[in-house]
């Protein structure tokens, strides 16, 4: 069994399967202290100094329409210092410093073909502060792979597979995943 979403998922694996359990089968690598301030500062340093692209402070500006794409609940991470909560707060702070207005920011859960993220899951993932900052104004949504009014047809692959993209993501000027 392994962690999946909010529970455990069982699977039968061949005897030859190598199973990696962090901290058990292999020692955990050294990591940052897990307090909010340490994680926030380390994340901010990374966001301000990205590899291979300009920092948000140069990409975003007043009038930018921004979406922040967030993994769904299947990816876990509901603790107070979860990477999602820390990185979203850092990104928001950087966007605000660059002149982006709150009303121009959308948070979208990227659940792919999983069921849509419901309101209760959104609040669990984001925590009360982030949820209450954006949900009342309608600035949190969930991708819906069956809502063709909010999908953009980008054509097909060389094999003929359709390529569809979420319209909210397609229409925005700055996307941060």
Predicted regions and their residues:
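A short, aliphatic-rich alpha-helical micro-motif
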Residues: 60, 169-170
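Structured loop/turn residues at beta-strand edges in well-structured enzyme cores
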Residues: 103, 170-171
């Amino acid at each position: 069994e392994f962690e999946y979403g909010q529970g455990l998922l069982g699977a039968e694996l061949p005897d030859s399967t190598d199973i990696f359990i962090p901290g058990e089968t292999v020692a955990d690598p050294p990591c940052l202290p897990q307090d909010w301030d340490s994680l926030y500062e380390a994340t901010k340093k990374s966001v301000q100094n990205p590899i291979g692209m300009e920092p948000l402070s140069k990409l975003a500006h007043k009038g930018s329409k921004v979406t922040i794409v967030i993994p769904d609940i299947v990816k876990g991470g509901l603790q107070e210092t979860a990477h999602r909560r820390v990185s979203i707060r850092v990104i928001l702070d950087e966007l605000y410093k660059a002149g982006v207005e709150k009303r121009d920011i959308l948070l979208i859960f990227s659940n792919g073909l999983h069921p849509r993220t419901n309101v209760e899951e959104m609040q669990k993932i984001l925590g009360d502060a982030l949820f209450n900052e954006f949900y009342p104004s309608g600035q949190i949504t969930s991708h819906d792979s069956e809502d063709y009014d909010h999908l953009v047809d980008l054509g097909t692959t060389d094999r003929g597979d359709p390529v569809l993209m979420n319209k909210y993501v397609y229409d925005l000027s700055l996307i941060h995943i």
